[in-house]
């Protein structure tokens, strides 16, 4: 059995990424919940960075909610032009409209943009699915 960190060991600052983290199905959100819980129980500082739907995490785990067009939950043609305000949103929509796997790619771009100015805040950045070339 693994014990909590001893006094001579410093806790790690860990970022866990999930482009889609439903707390009820699909696996990624459930995996992030249990992994973050156990890492926190070991004494580490844990941040989960996720796109919608967002996971349900235990108290003490920080959640960074990165927005998206949530194209798996919405009808593609229900998206209003005013929602496609930036280059990233337009590319995400066009990719989905042409059969691309848009959501993981767009999440990777958003996660990279969020992480770059904060790299020194983390010792480990773990992308569970590594579907994002931006990471």
Predicted regions and their residues:
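Catalytic nucleophile loop
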Residues: 32, 132-133
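Short glycine-rich, flexible loops that bind phosphorylated cofactors or substrates
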Residues: 23, 133-134
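N-terminal subdomain of nucleotide-sugar transferases
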Residues: 1-68, 116-120
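A conserved catalytic-core segment of Leloir-type glycosyltransferases
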Residues: 11, 38, 48-115
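Structural motif
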Residues: 123-124
